[in-house]
From Swiss-Prot:
One function term, GO molecular function aspect: RNA-directed RNA polymerase activity
Compartments where located: Virion; Host nucleus
Quaternary assembly: Influenza RNA polymerase is composed of three subunits: PB1, PB2 and PA. Interacts (via N-terminus) with PB1 (via C-terminus). Interacts with nucleoprotein NP (via N-terminus).
Domain of life from the UniProt record: Viruses
Name of the protein: Polymerase basic protein 2
Keyword terms: Cap snatching, Eukaryotic host gene expression shutoff by virus, Eukaryotic host transcription shutoff by virus, Host gene expression shutoff by virus, Host nucleus, Host-virus interaction, Inhibition of host RNA polymerase II by virus, mRNA capping, mRNA processing, Viral transcription, Virion
Origin species: Influenza A virus (strain A/Ruddy Turnstone/New Jersey/47/1985 H4N6)
Length: 759
């Protein structure tokens, strides 16, 4: 009671009431907020208030020796009074100006190196061109984009190791630099940043920008490569867009673009080979993009594209759990289904066996130019809300959704037979048969689908069978929306399996990807793609096949010539000769092969007829299955430059020209390499006699110890190998025969073998 009385007295005084009602400081919380803690609550105000003072800055005492007390205008730069509560001097903002003008100059050589990403950004903007601003509705969809142009693709852990090694080389802690890119970057940066005076922490931050890909999930309406994303705030608003052409490209965008092209080429090529999966892996492992191994890029690069994901799956890497159909990425957002085989009849009474999804499901569909939300039940489309850049793009999305729905009216809309095949001439599966059919012509599909009256819903309109918009009617279940559908934001990756035919499945057995989904779009890669695999020789046409085949023989001549004399069949079956067969006229392949093989056999049988140039020239022709015939040829035809060109069996031609003087071979005028020809047959009698019972394998091999003299050979066990010194101080590798019956032929072939092994 006492307290209340006291309060009432206080409030009766008008001043008290005024303070408590009209000022904002009537809350203990507010007073606390501005007075407790070390965190500055209003930095801008504090800064203004501080800078209004004469000496707002404190500095170490040493500053008094480094800066004069007054500047040229006679203004005081520092005060003799100490800063209250610290051992520092009070300094005027004018001192900063003096220091900037007259202080010691440091070397600026490291700035462009450390702040490389910023310097490059300025250059790109300087040379970029900004076009007109257009006002229109922006269909933006959120996509995961790269926000950091000009970076390498290291993982966070790899980058951390590189940064520690470059910036803090003497710090303790295990750092393992394993990948090629890690080692290269570390070496390069250590050299660049020698004697760098910039704060190590700053250097570390900047290195991180250069090494690691940073992605954000942002609303985008145009280009998604990082040089567009860095100016996103300048190029698109809610209702406007500004045209922009970047003033430079960055390697990370080029890598992404070139990776997609390489992956597409490899998947397309693998599809038509006998064992697609093995071929795909062989090509991925032997391909380089911009000088970096493709498999290293695949491990680090998060690009999601059908062909890239097939390559990743083949390498055992995890990929996104969404699946691809008709070039759209489908992600199930709710519902579930079970799969059941069902036979259906097309409008042409052709029977198709399709895997029906039974159950209610909702999907988002995201394509390059259109997006949609799809709700479906068993073989029934309930609703499709689609948005896209133009009529054409919207139509593409509608066709894919209609086929995916597996509705009966879609299957009945098929006119004519379905017999689409893939690159390897295998029939496509029924769902892709239907898709190809309607992608060619969807008129009947749209006419038979059915239309319905529509309600007026904000932001939605109807679409008619001829793909024109309408506010009254629409194709059954279909609406066109102004708003795009966001891409699936999660970066979650799942374990998948891949079969021989490159079909990728998740762990439940759902097909996520197949070669049919790989785009046929051709593009020109920004970075050089080097396919070392012979399977990719034909990508640049017949001439490239011809040159590459002969270059391969010359590069591998050492092993080729030993196989030529010992195991020709294995040599003829080498995959490197496969592309060459497409150049040889079909009718002549077998005859040429039979003729060349017979010729080679004669060379092997008759001493002294070994002719390196001729073997190299004719070898690719021997790879086809031979036909036994008595035919002789003086020239063999290959189809290049749009016509048949001749290779002379004995002698030079424009296709195959060996210059004895320079010992170089040119194929179609392109240099194919240098040849070391065999010397003339000398006296080889002695060695061949002594080397009976031994097989000559080739050049000396250090793993088998020092060279033995011919007398020491008798101690070898059957099948044992050794280096042996022969004739004029040459060393060859030999193996003691396992059977005695073959000894007779040894002395004949030994002469030739020694001669080949020495060269």
């Amino acid at each position: 009671m006492e307290r209340i009385k006291e309060l009432r007295d206080l409030l009766s005084q008008s001043r008290t009431r005024e303070i408590l009602t009209k000022t904002t400081v009537d809350h203990m919380a507010i007073i606390k907020k501005y007075t407790s803690g070390r965190q500055e609550k209003n930095p801008a105000l504090r800064m203004k208030w501080m800078m209004a003072m004469k000496y707002p800055i404190t500095a170490d005492k040493r500053i008094m020796e480094m800066i004069p007390e007054r500047n040229e205008q006679g203004q005081t730069l520092w005060s003799k009074t100490n800063d209250a509560g610290s051992d520092r001097v009070m300094v005027s903002p004018l001192a900063v100006t003096w220091w900037n003008r007259n202080g010691p100059a440091t070397s600026t050589v490291h700035y462009p190196k450390v702040y490389k990403t910023y310097f490059e950004k300025v250059e790109r903007l300087k040379h970029g061109t900004f076009g007109p601003v257009h006002f229109r509705n922006q269909v933006k969809i959120r996509r995961r984009v790269d926000i950091n142009p000009g970076h390498a693709d290291l993982s966070a852990k790899e980058a951390q190791d590189v940064i520690m090694e470059v910036v803090f080389p003497n710090e303790v802690g295990a750092r393992i630099l394993t990948s090629e890119s890690q080692l290269t970057i570390t070496k390069e940066k250590k050299e660049e940043l020698q004697d760098c005076k910039i704060a190590p922490l700053m250097v570390a931050y900047m290195l991180e920008r250069e090494l690691v890909r940073k992605t954000r999930f942002l609303p985008v309406a145009g280009g998604t490569s990082s040089v567009y994303i860095e100016v996103l705030h300048l190029t698109q608003g809610t209702c406007w867009e500004q045209m922009y052409t970047p003033g430079g490209e960055v390697r990370n965008d080029d890598v992404d673009q070139s990776l997609i092209i390489a992956a597409r080429n490899i998947v397309r090529r693998a599809t038509v080979s006998a064992d697609p999966l093995a071929s795909l892996l062989e090509m991925c492992h032997s391909t380089q993009i911009g000088g970096i191994r493709m498999v290293d890029i695949l491990r680090q690069n998060p690009t999601e594209e059908q062909a890239v994901d097939i390559c990743k799956a083949a390498m055992g890497l995890r990929i996104s759990s969404s699946f691809s159909f008709g070039g759209f990425t489908f992600k199930r957002t709710s519902g579930s289904s079970v799969k059941r085989e069902e036979e259906v009849l097309t409008g042409n009474l052709q029977t198709l066996k399709i895997r029906v999804h039974e159950g209610y499901e909702e999907f988002t569909m995201v394509g390059r130019r259109a997006t949609a939300i799809l709700r479906k039940a068993t073989r029934r489309l309930i609703q499709l809300i689609v948005s896209g850049r133009d009529e054409q793009s919207i139509a593409e999305a509608i066709i894919v959704a209609m086929v995916f729905s597996q509705e009966d009216c879609m299957i009945k809309a098929v006119r004519g037979d379905l017999n689409f095949v893939n690159r390897a001439n295998q029939r496509l599966n029924p769902m892709h048969q239907l898709l190809r059919h309607f992608q060619k012509d969807a008129k009947v599909l749209f006419q038979n689908w059915g239309i319905e009256p529509i309600d007026n819903v904000m932001g939605m309109i109807g679409i008619l069978p001829d793909m024109t918009p309408s506010t009254e009617m629409s194709l059954r279940g279909l609406r066109v929306s102004k708003m795009g559908v966001d891409e699936y934001s999660s970066t979650e990756r799942v374990v998948v399996s891949i079969d021989r035919f490159l079909r990728v499945r998740d762990q439940r057995g759902n097909v996520l990807l197949s070669p049919e989904e790989v785009s046929e779009t051709q593009g020109t890669e920004k970075l050089t793609i080097t396919y070392s695999s012979s399977m990719m020789w034909e990508i640049n046409g017949p001439e490239s096949v011809l040159v590459n085949t002969y270059q391969w023989i010359i590069r591998n001549w050492e092993t080729v010539k030993i196989q030529w004399s010992q195991d020709p069949t294995m040599l003829y079956n080498k995959m490197e000769f496969e592309p060459f067969q497409s150049l040889v006229p079909k009718a002549a392949r077998g005859q040429y092969s039979g003729f060349v093989r017979t010729l080679f056999q004669q060379m092997r049988d008759v001493l002294g007829t070994f002719d390196t140039v001729q073997i190299i020239k004719l070898l690719p022709f021997a790879a086809a299955p031979p036909e036994q015939s008595r035919m002789q040829f003086s020239s063999l035809t290959v189809n290049v430059r749009g016509s048949g060109m001749r290779i002379l069996v004995r002698g030079n031609s424009p296709v195959f020209n060996y210059n004895k003087a320079t010992k170089r071979l040119t194929v179609l005028g392109k240099d194919a390499g240098a040849l070391t020809e065999d010397p003339d047959e000398g006296t080889a009698g002695v060695e061949s006699a002594v080397l009976r019972g031994f097989l000559i394998l080739g050049k000396e091999d250090k793993r088998y110890g020092p060279a033995l003299s011919i007398n020491e050979l008798s101690n070898l066990a059957k099948g044992e190998k050794a280096n042996v010194l022969i004739g004029q101080g040459d060393v060859v590798l030999v193996m003691k025969r396992k059977r005695d019956s073959s000894i007779l032929t040894d002395s004949q072939t030994a002469t030739k073998r020694i001669r080949m092994a020495i060269n």
